[in-house]
Curated annotation (Swiss-Prot):
GO cellular component: small ribosomal subunit
GO molecular function terms attached to this record: rRNA binding; structural constituent of ribosome
KW RNA-binding (keyword) present: yes
Organism listed in the record: Borreliella afzelii (strain PKo) (Borrelia afzelii)
Statement: the UniProt record of this protein carries the keyword Ribosomal protein: yes
Gene that specifies this protein: rpsD
PANTHER family: 30S 40S RIBOSOMAL PROTEIN, SMALL RIBOSOMAL SUBUNIT PROTEIN US4M
Record keywords: Ribonucleoprotein, Ribosomal protein, RNA-binding, rRNA-binding
Sequence ranges assigned to domain S4 RNA-binding in this UniProt record: 95-159
Entry protein name: Small ribosomal subunit protein uS4
Assembly notes: Part of the 30S ribosomal subunit. Contacts protein S5. The interaction surface between S4 and S5 is involved in control of translational fidelity.
Length: 208
């Protein structure tokens, strides 16, 4: 296990949930269900309400790989939309291009998806893009560059991720042509519950 995997392993143990949605971290949680530095059934320190909100915010930050600057900006955008702010926040994060690439199985993880986008492998609506934080809208389409080696690689990724793929109804995948079409944002039921988004709303609302 390399250094990055060890760091991610500590994060899933700290949060007590597999925020990276990869089987290897389920194994880590099963083997070591307690947080790093805590052994056996040691008593947990009491966490304040602020501490709980901070933990939920960190879960979302690390799940989607967003920065400390990007997340509050996304929250501000979510507040502008009609409806429930917590759902709006998750909906925006789910429709960022790197997450769509990950959900469709083009990549093994969101970090892998960010690399794919930043390396210019992805074509969005006919134009090559390199910014993994682009928010997609209905009818946006993603293709892979017309390079045989790249298409073969992404095709292989799709095959290998098929068993664990969590593809919302709003994403249409054509695995034969390596094409993704965004139809609509996912419903709340289609978004894995990896954090309490209402606590994140409370966290940022107090700092507005």
């Amino acid at each position: 296990m390399n250094r990055k995997q060890i760091a991610k392993g500590k994060l899933v143990r700290r949060f007590g949930i597999n925020i990276f949605e990869q089987p290897k971290y389920d194994k880590i949680l099963k083997k070591k269900p307690h947080p790093p530095g805590m052994h056996g059934k040691a008593r947990k320190a009491k966490i304040t309400e602020y501490g709980k909100q901070l933990i939920e915010k960190q879960k979302i930050k690390f799940t989607y790989g967003v920065s400390e600057r990007q997340l509050p900006n996304t929250f501000k955008e979510a507040k502008k939309h009609h409806g429930v702010t917590g759902y709006n926040l998750l909906s925006i994060l789910e429709t960022i291009i790197d997450n769509i690439v990950y959900r469709a199985g083009f990549a093994f993880s969101r970090a892998h998806a960010r690399l794919i986008v930043s390396h210019g492998i992805v074509i969005l609506n006919g134009r090559r893009v390199t910014i993994p934080s682009i928010i997609l809208r209905a009818n946006d389409q993603i293709l892979i560059q017309e390079i045989d080696s790249l298409k073969k690689l992404i095709g292989s990724n799709i095959e290998q991720t098929s068993a664990q793929r969590n593809l919302p109804t709003g994403i249409e995948l054509n695995a034969d042509y390596l094409n993704i079409k965004v139809k609509h944002a996912p419903s709340r039921d289609e978004i894995p519950t990896l954090a309490n988004e209402q606590m994140v709303v409370e966290y940022y609302s107090k700092r507005a």
